[in-house]
Every structure is written in C-alpha cells, then in structure tokens.
Swiss-Prot record:
It is an enzyme of class 2 (transferase). One of its GO terms (molecular function) is ubiquitin binding. This is RanBP-type and C3HC4-type zinc finger-containing protein 1. It holds the Pfam family LTM. Residues 482-710 are annotated as: TRIAD supradomain. Zn(2+) 5 binds at residues 651, 654, 669, 672. Zn(2+) 2 binds at residues 504, 506, 527, 536. The gene is rbck1. A zinc finger (RING-type) spans 486-536, 651-680. The lineage of its organism: Eukaryota, Metazoa, Chordata, Craniata, Vertebrata.
Length: 714
C-alpha cells in the first residue's frame, strides 16, 4: 500500500532497473540539468505505436531537463538510447514545457499535446504505475512552475497571461509526501500511535487523498466471475477471469478488449450497488468462483460516444500492454528478480525493417532532433508491416452459423441455437467439406436416438389408444370419465355413473335419458341438451336406447318407428284386418298383399279384403251397402260440408280429413305425421322434412310471412 498527495495507489515492488533517475545529474550539454528520465513506449495520436528504426520499447526514454540560469526554463525531450553504446545520442523530439499540455489519461498512459495548432498529440505508455506516478509528479510541478514564470513575465511586460493549461492534479508538497510515506509504513507495521499522528497532520493540511489496499492483501489466483449482460432488448451470460484486486475501471477495459463494449456504455452492478471505477472487485464482495455481477449496456447516444472516438479507443486498447494482473502474478511467483521481466510490456508490432533503421540512423546523426512531422514519417515506414499483422486474413473464421437472437456462433450441423434455442436461419446450408468433430458426432447420434425413442413411444401410445377405443366401441353405453353434473336433474355424477353420448359427448344420468326416450313421440330421440344459445341436434344411437330401456319399452320404440315409417311412405298400405300391425309398400305390378302377421289376402286395388269375391263383385256390394246404410251416408255428407266450409281439410300427404280445433296455424297429421300449414292448406316443409325451405309454405324466409293471416305456423 502506498500513499501520495495525489491519492492512494496500489504499491508495486521497487524497480530494480536504472531507468528512473530522480535528483540532479549532468546532461549532455553543459547548460542544462536532467531532472528525471524514464523509459516509455510511444503511441502517436493514440492510434498506432511510434515505430523507430532499431529502437525497441526499451530504447525510448523521456527526459525532463531545466536551465539553472533561467527561471522556468524546462525542456521535455524524447531520446533514442539504442545507439548509446556507439557513442551517439539521438534526440527524436524536444519541446519547451511552456508550449505543451500534459495530461494523465490512465495510471500507465500519459498524453502530450501542443498548445498551438495543429494540436498534435503523442501518447506514452509506462512500464509500471509507480514510475508513471513519480514522473507525473515531477512533470506537473515543472509545468506549473513554467506557467507561473510565464505569467509573471507577461504581467511585468504589460501583456495578458496565456490561458491556463489543463493539468490533472495539484502539486504535492514534499512534506505531505513524506507524511504519506510515514503513514504507509506505520500502518504496515501496526504502529497505531504513529499512524494517528500522521493522519492528524494530513488532516490539518487538508490534503486531498484517496486510499486503496495493496495487491498483497488479496489472493494471487484468478476467479471466474459470472457476468449477466443486459441491454434494452436482450440479455445473455458470460464468464470472465478476473483478479479480486482488479478495479472496476480495469474490468471495463478488459470487457472492452474482449467483447468490444466501450467503457462509457458499461454500467456495473455488484451486490445491489452501482460500481465506481476506482474501487476493486473485492470491495464489492467478489472473492471466489461463481460470484455474480450485472453489466447493463446503455446506448452510444446516451453515453455521448461517437464512432470516431470508439474506433480510436478500440485501436488503442488492442495495442496496449497487458494488464497489471499478469505482471503482478509473474512477479509474485518468480520473486523480485523477475520484476523486470514481469513489468516488461509486450509488443504487438511486426518485426522491424532493419534496412530502414540503418538508413534513418545514418540520416539522423548523433544529435539531430525531429519534429512531429518527422515522427509521422517514421510511423508511416512501419504501416505496411503493421497492416499485414492486423489484416483480416490473419484471423481464423470459426465455421458455423450465427444466432440471429443472441449472436452465438453455433456449429454448422446444429438445428437450433445452443444458448437461446432459437431456430437456425432458413437460408443456411451446411458446407459440403465440413467434417463434424467427435462431440458433434455424439450429439447427432444422441439426437437420432432421441427421435427413435420418441417415435417408438408415440407408436406405443397410438396402439394403446386404439385398443382403448376398440374396447369402448364394444360397450353399448360409454361411462363418463370424470365427475360431471347432469343438465336435466342437476345431480352430481361420479365417474362411471353417467352416460356419455357418442354423437355429441354430452353427459346425462341414465334415469333422465330413459325418461326422454319414453316420452319422445318421434322415433329419433334427440339429445336433450339445451341452453340459452345452443340446442343440440344430435340423436341417440339404437344401441344406446336398447341398453337404457327395458325389453318391452324397446319393442314399443321399434313399433313406433315402424308406424312413423309407414305413415311417411307414399306407397305404403296397411293390412285391412282390425288391430293388425302388418303393412307393405306396393308397386304398380303387384295387386295383392299377403299379410305376414294375420295371414290374410289384401286387394291393393280395392284397399280391402274380399276373399271369395273379385274386385267387381266387391265394388257393387259396397255401393249397395252405402245406399242402404244411412249412418255411413250422414258421416260422408258431414265431412264434405266441413271441407267445403273451410273448417276441415284433406291432408296433402295421405288425403285423410284433418281439422284444427284451436291455437296456432300449425298442425300434424295423425296418420302420416306430416306437418301442415293451416292458413295455406299445404305442407309446412319441403320433401326433405323439417327445415327444408325448398318447398312448403316458406314462412319466415327473408323475414316474410307465408300468408297475411298467418298465426304462427312455426
């Protein structure tokens, strides 16, 4: 743990190299004194690394010097020390500190920009946070001193002072830093009294401080963090390897590098708390594998993120050195001797062009200094190799199809997304040269086996259902499978107590159905189900009626059906024997009917039984008896009078005389059961029976009455 006036930071082991020099040392020129020098790697405009011929990341050094004879005269130079062994010192660029702006972007990345147009920028990458913080402290102090002297000189000469340059932190006083160091030592040693004295002294100075535990307080092993990623329309789960001592800001950079979500659009929530960038994961309770964090993504417009800024930051993130997690792990595992190796930045650049290095080295000379335009030319020399290294042909494309819902890359033969179960795009086809791996072949085999088992189970179920239906069809009555209420008597029927009608699946109790059968005048017994909006028009089957009623009632129902069939048949003839139920359907070529019931011979021409006489003899005998029988004559005259006066009519089907006593204009013939419209003296329905409007009186068709005097013929 370390403490400075600029803020608490995680302490790194002291650098064993001689790359950082504090104090005063002689410079190459006799008129300047070097204040500090530090090794860096350079990125121009935050996009591509500064590629110098023959100069690796370890050969570039930032140097801050001052002129002792002139107050506020500071020079910031970028040197190439790769040619030091040959006795040459190459100054790549040198700036007057009053003409630049210096900004701390991240703990390991600083940016230098010109105060005057074209405002060119150079970004520096440092090896460790401790070196970068010490360098920033010295540079910021020198920068403020240079500006103060410039403002004083401008005031004395009557000129307006230049506008203030952007700085990142206030200049720490030496005494404050000493107290911070003493406080760190006292806390690490457990000296409560000394720590209290130092804390009181800092409180009296009102020093701006921030505290953060050192990495040594955390475990060195990575943990697997379960991250639930959500935006306004979708969500998914990913796993991220992190260290508990990592900050939220470092986690945002890691997600940016791995998944492309810019830190500005990331909102982290851990333990129902909105996370701050400077706090560590351990402070939010992340300690072991499986701990959960929530990442909410906002829109780029809401985060005020433009496409140019995103591309610039993305390219910078791809070329940045690895995180301090890996360097810390290597330093802890290998000891202090491995610190230089652990803190050495990795390079993603291709191999340098040695011929370009030799040419530029010869042209540069020992002490030649380059401007920003020359630096840009040096960068352009390495662009072909850099573009080749970052080209798309170097990237291996994973075979498969991308899920349109969650964008997961699935294997070509998979029919649905492995993550969200979405269907595979219809236009996708499996490549012809694709060969599935062992796991995919196993999955395909398991799918085939699952389909086979499903088809087998479905076939077994079909056979069981068919057997159940065959067994049920052999029963005359189908019992109700579950508890139900009879819609006639409203009695609750347990399973098996009621009867489920085959035609309509309506359920009633046996007693109610038996009563409906016995009370029905029509041989076709209709289903008794009725409600406010529906009347069932299905009928009971013959075997259902046979199973519900007794044998005598069943025979009576059959006889009733025969009677109705006889009356509705046009060519029917009933046996003339009294109380004989026999009847027949005659044809034109047949003149006699031998009744199978009473064994009598009926004459179909005379409609009578005249055994021993022919038809002529029977007609003469009938005429003679009618003349002498006054009762028969009076009956005949009365019926003719009723028909002529309109009080009676002949049935349009069988011709017998029917009479309406009272009520509506609908009546039914007692012989043939034909429905008759009294006002029109014709049949109510067409030849197909009830409901046929192709004939009959057509009453209420198109909302029109059949006759102006119609009194509801139904």
């Amino acid at each position: 743990m370390s403490l400075s006036s600029g803020g608490w930071t995680r302490a790194s082991p002291p650098a064993q190299s001689s790359s950082s020099h504090l104090g005063h040392e002689a410079s190459q020129s006799a008129c300047s004194t070097v204040l500090m020098s530090v090794k860096v790697s350079v990125c121009h405009s935050g996009i591509r690394p500064l590629c110098l011929p023959g100069a690796g990341d370890e050969s570039l050094r930032l140097q801050l010097s001052m002129d002792p004879g002139k107050a506020g005269e500071f020079r910031l130079a970028l040197r190439d020390i790769s040619a030091t062994a040959a006795g040459r010192s190459v100054f790549i660029a040198e700036f007057d500190l009053k003409t630049v702006q210096y900004e701390v972007k991240t703990p390991l990345c600083h940016e230098l920009s010109l105060a005057t147009p074209p405002h060119d920028r150079i970004s520096f990458k440092f090896r460790c946070e401790q070196e970068a913080q010490e360098w920033a402290t010295v540079v910021m102090s020198s920068l403020r001193e240079a500006h103060r002297v410039a403002i004083s000189s401008s005031t004395e000469e009557g000129r307006l002072p230049p506008p203030p340059l952007a700085t990142q932190s206030k200049a720490p006083m030496p005494r404050t830093e000493e107290i911070c160091a003493e406080l760190v030592s006292a806390i690490e040693a457990g000296d409560v009294r000394s720590a209290s004295v130092c804390a009181s002294s800092l409180a009296k100075q009102k020093a701006a401080l921030s505290i953060q535990p050192s990495k040594r307080n955390y475990t060195d092993s990575e943990v697997c963090l379960a991250v639930v990623v959500e935006d306004a329309s979708s969500s998914c789960c990913v796993s991220v390897k992190v260290f508990p001592h990592s900050t939220i800001g470092a986690l945002k950079q890691q997600v940016f590098s791995d998944y492309g979500f810019h830190p500005r659009v990331q909102r982290w929530v851990i333990g129902q708390s909105l996370c701050s960038d400077h706090r560590s994961l351990a402070s939010y309770g992340v300690q072991r594998d499986g701990d959960t964090a929530f990442l909410y993504l906002i829109s780029a417009r809401q985060a005020r993120l433009s496409r140019g800024i995103y591309q610039q930051d993305q390219e910078s993130a791809l070329l940045m050195v690895p995180t301090t997690h890996q360097a810390h792990q290597e330093a802890v595992s290998n000891g202090p001797a491995a610190l230089n190796t652990a803190s050495r930045p990795y390079s993603t650049l291709p191999t340098r062009l040695h011929n370009s290095h030799n040419t530029l080295s010869n042209n540069a000379g020992g002490s030649e200094r380059l401007g920003l335009s020359d630096i840009r030319d040096l960068i352009n020399l390495e662009l072909p190799q850099l573009n080749e290294a970052l080209g798309p042909n170097r990237t291996s494309i994973q075979p498969g199809w991308a899920c349109p819902t969650c964008t997961y890359i699935n294997k070509p033969t998979r029919p649905g997304c492995e993550m969200c179960s979405a269907d595979r795009p219809e236009g996708y086809t499996v490549p012809g040269n694709y060969r599935p791996d062992a796991l995919e072949l196993r999955r395909i085999q398991q799918e085939k086996e699952a389909i086979r088992q499903y088809q087998q189970a479905r076939e077994t179920e079909r056979r069981e259902n068919f057997a159940r239906l065959v067994q049920m069809d052999g029963q005359d009555l189908v019992p109700n499978p579950e508890r139900v209420e009879c819609r006639i008597c409203y009695v609750e029927l347990e399973s098996g107590e009621g009867v489920l009608l085959r035609e309509c699946l309506h359920c009633f109790c046996k007693e109610c159905l038996r009563s409906v059968i016995l009370m029905s005048e029509d041989p076709q017994v209709a289903c008794p189900y009725r409600d406010e909006s529906y009347a069932c028009d299905c009928v009971l089957q013959e075997r259902e009626i046979r199973a519900l009623v007794s044998v005598d009632d069943y025979q009576h129902w059959l006889q009733r059906g025969l009677s109705v069939a006889e009356s509705r048949c046009e060519g029917s003839y009933h046996c003339a024997t009294a109380d004989c139920p026999g009847w027949c359907v005659y044809e034109d070529t047949v003149n006699t009917f031998h009744c199978p019931v009473c064994k009598k011979q009926n004459c179909l021409l005379c409609k009578a039984i005249h055994e021993g006489m022919n038809c002529k003899q029977y007609q003469d005998d009938l005429t003679a008896r009618a003349i002498n029988d006054s009762a028969a004559r009076r009956t005949r005259d009365l019926l003719k009078t009723l028909v002529n006066s309109g009080e009676a009519m002949h049935c349009p089907q069988c011709g017998i005389i029917v009479q309406k006593k009272e009520g509506c204009d609908w009546l039914r013939c007692t012989v043939c059961h034909t429905e008759i419209c009294w006002v029109t003296r014709g049949p109510r329905w067409g030849p197909k029976g009830p409901g046929d409007i192709s004939g009959g009186c057509r009453c209420n068709v198109n909302k029109q009455r059949c006759h102006p005097k119609c009194q509801n013929c139904h």
